[in-house]
Amino acid sequence: MSDNKLIVILGSGPGIGASTGALFASMGFDVALLSRNVERLGQDVIRVQIANPRVRVKAYPVDVGDHNGLALALAQVHADLGPPEVVYFNAARVAPSKIGGTSPDLVLEDFKSMNIGLFVAASWALPHLTAAAERPGTHPSFLFTNSGLWDRPLADLASLSMQKAAQYNLMLSLKQMVEAKGVHVAGVNIGGLVRDEDPVINANNIARALFDLSQEDKPDWQWEVKVGDWDEFLKQMAGQKAA
């Protein structure tokens, strides 16, 4: 078993997930990547491993919305790599959806992946992170990404807006449970579209914000860090519609 710390990333992908994995790997973390896209997972593993050939990087193909399959995958992560010090939930589906124009089945599938998956991940992580908090020199953290959708939704993204509000609520509940036990629960609030060419809202900046949150000492814990400006993003969206 490696002496390296471990981050588990649920919802890996070529953007934030892989960038976060690569940054943590460069800092000496072993990395577990979970996603249902097998081909993309292989590409993510290569990218993360290049960041540090001396750490272990493993892929776990799983549909995060399948709560039984996810529980089995997380158990395998523990068997392969040991207990996590950081868990990062990044699973999301960004697609148009409107009230009256979207199948309830689609909304249900979104809830399974973005909230039941988050619930399963938090339930699994809970004993591992609280145990880690008992050891000196650790920074056990449960991290997630959110956006202004949680309290300022967009009607064209009705399902995603619903899921983000529920995620925010669930993470506040987790925070209430574990904060006194030494586990940091925190999120990065993304204020717009993530694009490589954006000087602020890009995957590398978000990864850095996540890493910095994970390393905060308890007196300095933040619940939320904002990357970008949601108010400005909404103004831009309104301007585009008016045009």
Specify the residue positions occupied by each region the protein language model found:
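Rossmann-fold cofactor-recognition segment
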Residues: 50-68
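Conserved glycine-rich Rossmann-like NAD(P)H-binding loop of the short-chain dehydrogenase/reductase
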Residues: 29-43
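Catalytic loop of short-chain dehydrogenase/reductase
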Residues: 110, 130-166, 172, 179, ...
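C-terminal helical subdomain
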Residues: 180-243
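Amphipathic alpha-helical dimer-interface segment in Rossmann-like NAD(P)H-dependent oxidoreductases
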Residues: 75, 79, 113-136
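Conserved glycine-rich cofactor-binding loop
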Residues: 13-14
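Conserved NAD(P)H cofactor-binding loop of Rossmann-fold oxidoreductase domains
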Residues: 88-96
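Catalytic Tyr-X3-Lys loop
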Residues: 100-120, 167
